[in-house]
C-alpha cells in the first residue's frame, strides 16, 4: 500500500482552506455600509450571494472534518494547530451570518410597513363623495326605470256632456249657483211675472239682488217652461203650509214668535218627546 506524505498534506489542504476562508472573511469586512445597503435593497442578489456562501461553507465543513480526522491519525500536533486555527474562523462565520440575517430582516420589515401605509393611503374609503355619487346615480337610474311610462298607455275616456256642463259651471260660478234658501212657488211665479211685465226694469241681476239668490238661479227660473198641474199645486201648497207652521213653532220656542194652538204640536220638543203618540192619546 502506498504511503501518504504528511508534509504534502500539511502544505496543501489546510493551507488552501485557510486561505479561502480568510479571503471570504476579508471581503466581507472590507465591504462598507454602502455595499450592505445595496445588498439589502436588492434581495435577489443578497439571497443569491447567501445561497452561494451557504453552499460553499457547507461543502467546506465535511472536508474540514475529514481532513481533521485524517491529520489526527497522522500527526496529533498538526490536528491541534488546525483546530486552534479553525475555531476563530467558525466564530467569525457565525457573526457574519447573524449580521446578514439582521440586514435581510430589517428591509423586509420596512418594506412591509411602507407597503401597508401605501395601501391605506391608496385605498379609498367607502364614505368618499365619489362612492356616494355613484350610489345616488344607481338609485336614480333604478327609479327612472321603474317610473317609465308604458309604451301603450290606456286611452283616456272622453268626458260626457253632463261632466263638461258641470266643469263649465264651476269655472263660471266659483261660489256655486244653487240658492242658499228655497223659494216658494209664489216667489217663483212672482219672478216670472215681474220679468214678463217689465224685462228691461226687472233684469236678472236686479231680481237676484231682490230675492237674495244667485243670478244663475234667476236665469234658470226664467228659462224653465215647466208648469205644475192642479194636483201638484195643491200638494205643494199644503207642504209649504206645514213648513211655515214648523218654522213658527221653532221660533216660538226661542221666544221670537207667540205660541199658537196650531203650531204647538209641531214644536221640536213635542216631536222629540211624544211624536205622534200625543195625538192618539188626545183622541182616546
Swiss-Prot record:
Principal cellular location given in the protein's record: mitochondrion
Pfam families, alphabetized: Neugrin
The keyword Secreted appears for this protein: no
Tell me the keywords, alphabetical order: Mitochondrion, Transit peptide
Cellular component terms per the entry's GO annotation: mitochondrion; nucleus
The UniProt entry, under InterPro entries, shows: NGRN/Rrg9
Q: Where is the composition biased (Basic and acidic residues)?
A: 157-175
Where do the segments described as Disordered lie? 76-181, 259-284
Q: Where is the composition biased (Low complexity)?
A: 76-87
* Stretches with biased composition (Polar residues): 268-284
Q: What does this protein do?
A: Required for respiratory activity and maintenance and expression of the mitochondrial genome.
Protein's UniProt name: Required for respiratory growth protein 9, mitochondrial
Tell me the gene name: rrg9
Amino acid at each position: 500500500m502506498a504511503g501518504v506524505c504528511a508534509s504534502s498534506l500539511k502544505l496543501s489542504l489546510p493551507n488552501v482552506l485557510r486561505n479561502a476562508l480568510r479571503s471570504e472573511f476579508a471581503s466581507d469586512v472590507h465591504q462598507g455600509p454602502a455595499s450592505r445597503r445595496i445588498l439589502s435593497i436588492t434581495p435577489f442578489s443578497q439571497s443569491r450571494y447567501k445561497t452561494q456562501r451557504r453552499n460553499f461553507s457547507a461543502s467546506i465543513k465535511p472536508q474540514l472534518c475529514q481532513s481533521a480526522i485524517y491529520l489526527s491519525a497522522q500527526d496529533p500536533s498538526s490536528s491541534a494547530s488546525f483546530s486552534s486555527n479553525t475555531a476563530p474562523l467558525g466564530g467569525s462565520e457565525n457573526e457574519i451570518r447573524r449580521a446578514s440575517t439582521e440586514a435581510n430582516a430589517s428591509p423586509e420589515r420596512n418594506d412591509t410597513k411602507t407597503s401597508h401605509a401605501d395601501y391605506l393611503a391608496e385605498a379609498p374609503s367607502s364614505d368618499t363623495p365619489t362612492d356616494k355619487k355613484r350610489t345616488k346615480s344607481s338609485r336614480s337610474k333604478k327609479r327612472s326605470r321603474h317610473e317609465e311610462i308604458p309604451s301603450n298607455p290606456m286611452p283616456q275616456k272622453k268626458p260626457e256632456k253632463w261632466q263638461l256642463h258641470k266643469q263649465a259651471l264651476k269655472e263660471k260660478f266659483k261660489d256655486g249657483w244653487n240658492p242658499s234658501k228655497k223659494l216658494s212657488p209664489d216667489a217663483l211665479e212672482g219672478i216670472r211675472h215681474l220679468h214678463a211685465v217689465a224685462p228691461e226694469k226687472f233684469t236678472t241681476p236686479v231680481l237676484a239682488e231682490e230675492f237674495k239668490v244667485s243670478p244663475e238661479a234667476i236665469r234658470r227660473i226664467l228659462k224653465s217652461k215647466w208648469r205644475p198641474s192642479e194636483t201638484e199645486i195643491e200638494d205643494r201648497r199644503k207642504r209649504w203650509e206645514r213648513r211655515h207652521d214648523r218654522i213658527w213653532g221653532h221660533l216660538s220656542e226661542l221666544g221670537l214668535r207667540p205660541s199658537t194652538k196650531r203650531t204647538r204640536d209641531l214644536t221640536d220638543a213635542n216631536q222629540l218627546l211624544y211624536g205622534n203618540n200625543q195625538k192618539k192619546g188626545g183622541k182616546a
